């Protein structure tokens, strides 16, 4: 699944393998994917901003194109 097309429901966490896979990830928008900082390297079009580690995973993770 394309990282940008990945849904982003609230209240959970995200994982990555070959592409970004959001599994109940907490983020501001449900139209973009959301990954924790450690997923940046595999989520090519997904960037985490506003926090790092647990803080980013918690609620400050956002996705840009």
UniProtKB/Swiss-Prot annotation:
A divalent metal cation 1 binds at residues 6, 8, 22, 25. A divalent metal cation 7 binds at residues 48, 61, 63-64. The modification N-acetylmethionine is found at residue 1. A divalent metal cation 5 binds at residues 34-35, 48. SUPFAM superfamilies: Metallothionein (SSF57868). InterPro entries: Metalthion_dom_sf, Metalthion_dom_sf_vert, Metalthion_vert. Residues 1-30 are annotated as: Beta. A divalent metal cation 3 binds at residues 16, 20, 25. A divalent metal cation 4 binds at residues 42, 46. This is Metallothionein-3.
């Amino acid at each position: 699944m394309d990282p940008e097309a990945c849904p982003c429901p609230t209240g959970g966490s995200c994982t990555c393998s070959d592409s970004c896979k959001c599994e109940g990830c907490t983020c501001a928008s449900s139209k973009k994917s959301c990954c924790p900082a450690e997923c940046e390297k595999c989520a090519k079009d997904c960037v985490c901003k506003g926090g790092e580690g647990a803080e980013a995973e918690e609620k400050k993770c956002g996705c840009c194109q």
